[in-house]
């Protein structure tokens, strides 16, 4: 049983130097007695107590097909929500094989139909009312992946690669203003996504784990049949690395370095409404910009006082600790000014919205104490 209670009373008045916009122009020198007009006004009162039922079934089996080891996982998830009287059934399956090769490889293929049920934010339309005809967003997807474990310079490594494609419909578009998200409250979009991910994990330095990952992905949507444009979550290229090292004579002293580079996400679409508060669904096609690329370097230095290997302590007060590490971290070490979103400023004369970047935190320091009893 769920309970959602919502009261909305939102309005915007643009005022400057004694006059408000939009205004009815009058002859200079005469009194403007026109009514005060708001740029938009949204009001709604909602109170619902819906019931949601859900369940799932799963089947797993491992067996040999000749010399090939086979893993099968299949299942189905179902739910019903009486707010919109929708029943969804989501089947999915994964099939994996591990050949009897000298190389340690695992191949997997997975697919299914997945639903994202709407909740408070998604069911609320731009008029401030709950839409009882809203449907779950749906994705039909297939994923191919490979795990390759090997040894290089006599140290263990694992390379994981993955490629996927998703066909999506019944999407609910949303708008971004600064870090605020507002959904359209309508299933008026469809889209697709595809991408490739690769991650190398292993001991670049003996005894400590590090990793490198890279990915490329695109996400598009088509709102009201107007054509495909990038979704606000369109990530494009991303590269990241986590590297650890230690002093040979003092292995309990460790340093780590984290590098991240990512193409900028779409800047989002301003919440564009007319004077009656009606949404402008053309806006996403007018504001196709991307944020600047995201770049960040984090540096950390730590000292391991106690662990279960070379620094084990028996007896006394410190014997109560299984692990004890003190670390100092510098986040965003090069003080790079990254942009997280845009704040949209409206020009009342042209009704165009200009983006003003919202910056993330610059360089800062952190001291961390980790322990395990």
Residue ranges of predicted features:
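Membrane-embedded beta-barrel scaffold of Gram-negative outer-membrane proteins
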Residues: 98-100, 108, 136-194, 326
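Short loop/turn motifs that connect adjacent beta-strands in outer-membrane beta-barrel proteins
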Residues: 64-70, 100-106, 151-157, 206-207, ...
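Transmembrane beta-barrel strands of outer-membrane/channel proteins
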Residues: 1-2, 74-78, 93-95, 109-113, ...
């Amino acid at each position: 049983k769920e309970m959602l209670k919502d009261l909305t009373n939102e309005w915007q008045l643009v005022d400057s130097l004694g006059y408000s916009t939009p205004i009815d122009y009058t002859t200079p020198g005469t009194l403007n007695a026109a009514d005060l007009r708001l740029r938009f006004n949204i009001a709604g009162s909602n109170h619902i107590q819906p019931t949601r039922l859900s369940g799932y079934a799963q089947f797993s089996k491992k067996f040999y097909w000749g010399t090939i080891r086979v893993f099968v996982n299949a299942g189905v998830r179902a739910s019903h929500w009486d707010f919109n009287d929708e029943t969804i059934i989501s089947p999915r399956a994964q099939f994996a094989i591990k050949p009897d090769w000298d190389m340690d490889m695992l191949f997997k293929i997975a697919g299914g139909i997945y639903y994202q049920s709407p909740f408070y934010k998604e069911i609320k339309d731009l008029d401030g009312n709950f839409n009882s005809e809203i449907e779950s967003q749906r994705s039909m997807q297939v994923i191919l992946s490979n795990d390759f474990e090997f040894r290089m310079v006599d140290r263990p490594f694992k390379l994981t690669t993955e490629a996927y494609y998703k066909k999506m419909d019944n999407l609910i578009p949303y708008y971004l203003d600064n870090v605020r998200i507002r959904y359209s409250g309508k299933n008026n979009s469809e889209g697709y996504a595809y991408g490739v991910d690769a991650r190398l994990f292993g001991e670049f330095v003996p005894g400590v784990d590090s990793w490198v990952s890279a990915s490329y992905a695109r996400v598009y949507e088509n709102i009201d049949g107007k054509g495909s444009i990038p979704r606000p979550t369109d990530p494009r290229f991303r590269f990241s690395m986590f590297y650890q090292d230690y002093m040979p004579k003092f292995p309990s002293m460790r340093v780590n370095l984290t590098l991240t580079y990512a193409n900028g996400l779409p800047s989002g679409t301003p919440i564009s409404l007319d004077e009656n508060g009606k949404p402008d669904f053309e806006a996403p096609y007018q504001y196709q910009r991307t944020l600047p690329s995201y770049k960040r370097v984090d540096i950390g230095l730590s000292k391991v006082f106690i662990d279960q290997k070379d620094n084990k302590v028996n007896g006394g007060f410190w014997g109560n600790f299984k692990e004890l590490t003190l670390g100092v971290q510098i986040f965003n070490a090069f003080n790079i000014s990254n942009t997280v979103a845009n704040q949209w400023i409206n020009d009342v004369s042209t009704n165009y919205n200009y983006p003003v970047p919202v910056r993330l935190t610059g360089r800062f320091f952190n001291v961390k104490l980790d322990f395990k009893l």
